[in-house]
């Protein structure tokens, strides 16, 4: 179903039952344009989203990771469902594909085509689009939860929408990218620029996958050979690259990683946050080391820090959550 809203503050409520087989779609910013941080104005922004539970004025907003989408039921089953932290019987759960994404929302490629070149997007731009969606759904208060890029986007929500965000959960994400993280993204974008059309994106994914795991994790899961003469880790990385290139857009990859790299809130910005926040670090995370995540949490006046102990690196929040769902559920209910 697609609904067209005249303006970003419309109170139109989409009342169809949530369809877990595909997202709902709404068009926002028809009457008043969305003003981007780069100075451009966008009209007719399409947003793809999923909802779970009965619509109401307070909700939990899930923010997806870099290559994710709005189908939380597909990629976060440890968190969504009966008796889990995001229980549709007790909560109204919303997740939208971000601005610039390639899973139903107006994409980076579409923006480039209509604006005669790439359009720089910011995480704050994405938060403003998300807020417009919540306005259209009649949501007035929200609990925000995100991991990886979604965690960085949660920081943007805390800064951009302080009147709307009741509390936030930030998993495996810093408030700002370090030179290490920017360097990894720079290498990925360089690969895409040198080999557009999919081959560069495959290499970008291989670079990213190494930062998402840990040496011990790969030693346990990708040792030896599955094909004679080919190391298992080589087969694994090739498979991951092929899989992403088949479903993801390289312009989206560049736009979203650039937005993450450019998001650099000051310590004063973070100290102004008044909402309670649960920040989760991952003990073996190479991309966002736990010490870095913990240091960002210390800049928030009302943050609790908890660390997930796992050998599986950054992706442990998906691969090896252990007690994480229980910790998150307790915080959201408190």
Curated annotation (Swiss-Prot):
Q: What class of enzyme is it?
A: transferase
Q: Which GO MF term does the entry hold, naming one? A: homoserine O-acetyltransferase activity
Pfam families recorded:
Abhydrolase_1 (PF00561)
Under catalytic activity, the entry for this protein gives:
L-homoserine + acetyl-CoA = O-acetyl-L-homoserine + CoA
Q: Which residues form the signal peptide?
A: none
Q: Which pathway does this chain act in?
A: Amino-acid biosynthesis; L-methionine biosynthesis via de novo pathway; O-acetyl-L-homoserine from L-homoserine: step 1/1
Q: Mainly resides where? A: cytoplasm
The UniProt similarity line reads: Belongs to the AB hydrolase superfamily. MetX family.
Its recorded name reads Homoserine O-acetyltransferase
Q: Which organism is it from?
A: Deinococcus radiodurans (strain ATCC 13939 / DSM 20539 / JCM 16871 / CCUG 27074 / LMG 4051 / NBRC 15346 / NCIMB 9279 / VKM B-1422 / R1)
